[in-house]
Amino acid sequence: MGIFSIANQHIRFAVKLATAIVLALFVGFHFQLETPRWAVLTAAIVAAGPAFAAGGEPYSGAIRYRGFLRIIGTFIGCIAGLVIIIAMIRAPLLMILVCCIWAGFCTWISSLVRIENSYAWGLAGYTALIIVITIQPEPLLTPQFAVERCSEIVIGIVCAIMADLLFSPRSIKQEVDRELESLLVAQYQLMQLCIKHGDGEVVDKAWGDLVRRTTALQGMRSNLNMESSRWARANRRLKAINTLSLTLITQSCETYLIQNTRPELITDTFREFFDTPVETAQDVHKQLKRLRRVIAWTGERETPVTIYSWVAAATRYQLLKRGVISNTKINATEEEILQGELEVKVESAERHHAMVNFWRTTLSCILGTLFWLWTGWTSGSGVMVMIAVVTSLAMRLPNPRMVAIDFIYGTLAALPLGLLYFLVIIPNTQQSMLLLCISLAVLGFFLGIEVQKRRLGSMGALASTINIIVPDNPMTFHFSQFLDSALGQIVGCVLAFTVILLVRDKSRDRTGRVLLNQFVSAAVSAMTTNVARRKENHLPALYQQLFLLINKFPGDLPKFRLALTMIIAHQRLRDAPIPVNEDLSAFHRQMRRTADHVISARSDDKRRRYFGQLLEELEIYQEKLRIWQAPPQVTEPVHRLAGMLHKYQHALTDS
């Protein structure tokens, strides 16, 4: 496909984006909004953002959800802007400085919350700054400006949603159904690889792919939940399937690791059984039926615990999968599975990264303020706004540098494109509403196609072009104002990019170490006799951390294996029959406190000291288990955990 070619699958969304822009323009002019540009700009960003992220037409519900987040972010930003202005209107410089800190604070929060919800906080940060900068000439009009901005943005969002509904958005349900079938086959094939105990790299690749696919399925569940309330039952089942899929991965990998030391545990019966190849979910269904009969014949005690647990989880997966596909009423058996365990939310390991993002945003906004005051440029306020927008939106993404480059390319492309519209196309519409709508629809259509291709600069070009041509009724043509605005956008993006380059983010290694220590803490916390604590479901949170580790350190297999071993230890100890007595319970609490100290330690020396203390406590704990005559199901996983921590103590403590 050529660089300027148009694929059939891109046309519908391009028409949808053009419709959203035209609707927002028409409504803005009809109700004589003060700045209809904000409505048009909002409609374009809300519609195009999910398409750029998806690399194609977004699924149903994505645009609505993004619009909802934009409304929340705008209202938070407007309220914050009003509070800052009311409190500091007599000190304008201090007021702008506080706004810069507010933008940094919102970026800090957006770096810690779920990536789906971070958009609202990023928006709240620069909305307050926009309000404070815009009302500088007439501060008494602040409430009116805040209300107008909120109204225009809501109108733009409604127009984007109407355009989305008008062109029958894609449902993700069929993709979910197909992935559920395919994922079950992949889980069975992973178990086959682990029982064969072949090449470790092949197994690592297989379980790594399954972790990614399970995480992607969780993202599909979020999309399905946004799509319609009729999928509420499917959503509940998919949430449980996420845990079951992670359980299957854990049991398969533990089966592989067990054979490193005790290969005789996997009998020839099971080796021969898992030799049979499977291609479809129906093949897996038949094999599971046969496997359950084999287990019933051999007995639970003669079946390796990992295979027994794997079959139980796969059977539940199958049952819930059928319910998701049919979306029928939840029966009693399913309800028992769904009423399982409470999921635990883990503390973010990226606090240092979030603080770096805070300083990047705050310093870049302060730099923009100094640039504005030093130059006295009429478009200095535009520079500041662009800096805030770029840093607030870029910092919440994995590669902020590339996002800033995308904005630079977009603003550079917007200059000639905006010139064409401002000097040639729009003047020739001769104040005709129809011709103006057609001209902007053409812009939206072609940029909508480029956005779906994820062309570098396409998203920035769309927003920047609409921003500098300033659609108004009647249109006014002040070329110096246009040029100032266009150059202000470019300078703002360049300054933001400069700050991102200068304020280096060296938090990757620290984040990796914190993640690994959180895995250790989770494994230690599984050693408990507290019934409520044993019922807590840590598995989704642990695999979410593992997925972050994979993204932070692609190709670092030793780290992934260590993390996976800790997850396996956690699951095994969680189900282990630990003797119930006050002596062991008190020691469990002591070990959890020590593990927490390891995570929170700010220096290598303290971390090494607490980690050494944890290793000593594990030795004492093993002696206590012998005194209290704990069964091998307890002593063996504790011994393996202590051995792993001894082996990798330098990786877990040194910066």
Curated annotation (Swiss-Prot):
UniProt-listed InterPro entries: PHBA_efflux_AaeB/fusaric-R, PHBA_efflux_pump_AaeB
Q: What gene does the UniProt entry assign to this protein?
A: aaeB
Molecular function terms, GO-annotated: transmembrane transporter activity
Q: Where are the transmembrane segments?
A: 13-33, 38-58, 69-89, 93-113, 121-141, 152-172, 370-390, 407-427, 431-451, 482-502
Protein name stated in the entry: p-hydroxybenzoic acid efflux pump subunit AaeB
According to its UniProt entry, this protein's organism is Shigella dysenteriae serotype 1 (strain Sd197)
| Stated role | Forms an efflux pump with AaeA. Could function as a metabolic relief valve, allowing to eliminate certain compounds when they accumulate to high levels in the cell.
PANTHER family the record matches: MULTIDRUG RESISTANCE PROTEIN MDTO, P-HYDROXYBENZOIC ACID EFFLUX PUMP SUBUNIT-RELATED
Name a single GO biological process: carboxylic acid transport
UniProt keyword list:
Cell inner membrane, Cell membrane, Membrane, Transmembrane, Transmembrane helix, Transport
Q: Name one GO cellular component term.
A: plasma membrane
One Pfam family, short name: FUSC
Family to which this protein belongs: Belongs to the aromatic acid exporter ArAE (TC 2.A.85) family.
How does it sit in the bilayer?
A: Multi-pass membrane protein
Major localization class: membrane
